[in-house]
Regions:
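ATP-binding N-terminal substructure of ATP-dependent carboxylate-amine bond-forming enzymes
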Residues: 1-94
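Active-site nucleotide/adenylate-binding loops and adjacent lid/helix of ATP-dependent enzymes
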Residues: 4-5, 100-181, 235, 239-251
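Solvent-exposed alpha-helices and their adjacent loops that cap or buttress functional pockets
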Residues: 21, 36-38, 90, 112-114, ...
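Glycine/small-residue-rich loop that forms an oxyanion/phosphate-binding "nest" at active or ligand-binding sites
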Residues: 67, 78-93, 98-117, 121
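Internal nucleotide-binding/catalytic subdomain
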Residues: 152, 156-293
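Active-site "cap" helix and flanking loop/linker of ATP-utilizing ligase/carboxylase catalytic domains
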Residues: 246-268, 285-353
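Peripheral (often C-terminal) accessory segments that flank ATP-dependent C-N-forming ligase machineries
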Residues: 310-423
């Protein structure tokens, strides 16, 4: 089989490495891929949002199956386009990807179908939003309606911060059209949990839960990032909570999308907050999370391609999906200065003996060498029997990788470890 994978991050590298375990897979193309992915797939310089280019390439290269993982091409209708060419895909169509593409849509969906989430108001005028903030409870959360590279959510600790966020998003157009409307919502507290799931629009199979670390610096300080590391499973996510989420959140979401004529197939990501009043949805993503994928897929015992195809063809209920009972930890190594300004072009040295555990993101190939080209450069994952061992092993591997201006958090998994050892 010839497989096409759209995207260029560590998440795509994790997907590609897992797909390679299937003997039917003869060739994997990554569009555009990156310098590190080039060791595991043929990278083709067609951007993830160049839907015409992707379709043209797929048509001319006998692609048997396509995996579309980034949010932008999904929201732009990449899957619809490839399906029209007769190419089966993993990922939702455009009318279902809106669950991530529009915060206003997803909040209204939850309200309409009684899915637990934070209280909220929607505004399409800055004046109205600013007036509302004069008396709104603080802290509060401001969300741009559309996609904003994961940067469109601002937690405002003061009224002034909240108003500043509204002005930046709606008047200064910090995120362009994505900020034409905003959601202002209640600030929830409690442990956060990421749950990725496979779904064919009828059956939902949750993957192993994980805990992301969004802030750039230790002790959850610094700016928000795309994610600086993850551990799986998440110790706060007990069987009792998982059962409750299936009944109150996961299945109701799939059923709500069906009722709206927007059947969702692919990977649906649930960002959850475990509040005193039970689990609530903070966000939906219409695809694998990054770096959650880098801990969840290494724990998947079943064949990934088989499970993906089951979501496409509606046979997930008959397809066994098994996960290891081990623990995984991923530490993200970034360029100093991320997520603001950082230098690029530094050579990356990864010892051969740990290469299988490394998922490359912001790196390019230059004169036969791998060099830094992005903020989050790579993630290194360890799978061990216990969480403590997985964390220690991931850091041991990270210390063996070298590039100029590298930095990473030193407390990935510390909170999870404390929770595990409290039990």
């Amino acid at each position: 089989m010839n497989i096409l994978v759209v995207g260029s991050g560590g998440r795509e590298h994790a997907v590609i490495k897992k797909l390679r375990e299937n003997n039917e897979v003869k060739k994997i193309y990554a569009l555009p891929g990156n310098g590190g992915i080039a060791a595991d797939a043929e990278c083709v310089n067609i951007g993830a949002t160049d839907i015409d280019g992707i379709a043209e390439f797929a048509k001319n290269n006998q692609i048997d199956y396509a995996v579309v993982t980034p949010d932008d091409p999904l929201v732009l209708g990449c899957v619809d386009r490839l399906e029209r060419l007769g190419i089966p895909c993993f990922g939702p169509r455009k009318n279902a990807a809106i669950i991530e593409g529009s915060k206003v849509f997803s909040k209204n969906l939850m309200k309409k179908y009684g899915i637990p989430t934070a209280q909220y108001e929607v505004f399409d005028s800055a004046e109205d939003a600013l007036a509302y903030l004069d008396s709104a409870p603080i802290p509060t959360v401001i969300k741009a309606d559309g996609l904003a590279l994961g940067k469109g959510v601002i937690i405002a600790a003061t009224r002034d911060e909240a108003k500043e966020a509204v002005v930046e998003i709606m008047r200064d157009k910090k995120f362009g059209k994505s900020g034409d409307s905003i959601v202002i919502e209640e600030f929830l507290t409690g442990p956060e949990v990421s749950v990725l799931s496979f779904t064919d629009g009828k059956t939902v199979v949750p993957m192993i839960s994980s805990m992301d670390h969004k802030r750039a610096l230790d002790n959850d300080e610094g700016l928000n990032t795309g994610g600086m590391g993850t551990v799986a499973p998440n110790p706060y996510y007990t069987k009792e909570i998982a059962d409750r989420c299936m009944k109150e959140i996961f299945l109701p979401t799939i059923n709500a999308m069906n009722a709206e004529g927007r059947t969702f197939k692919g990977c649906l990501y649930f960002g959850l907050m475990l509040t005193e009043n039970g689990p609530k949805v903070i966000e939906y993503n219409c695809r694998f999370g990054d770096p959650e994928t880098q801990v969840v897929l290494p724990l998947l015992k079943s064949d990934l391609l088989t499970v993906m195809r089951a979501t496409t063809y509606g046979t997930l209920a008959e397809t066994p999906v098994e996960f290891s009972d081990k623990n995984a930890c991923c530490v993200v190594m970034a360029s100093k200065g991320y997520p603001v300004a950082y230098e690029k072009g530094y050579e990356i040295d990864i010892p051969d003996e740990i290469r299988d555990s490394v998922y490359v993101a912001g790196a390019a190939e230059k004169n036969g060498k791998l060099v830094t080209s992005g903020g989050r450069v790579l993630g290194v994952t360890a799978v061990e029997d216990t969480l403590r061992e997985a964390i220690a092993s991931a850091y041991e591997k990270a210390e063996k990788i070298h590039f100029e201006n590298a930095f990473y958090r030193h407390d990935i998994g510390a909170k999870a470890l404390a929770a595990t050892e409290e039990k």
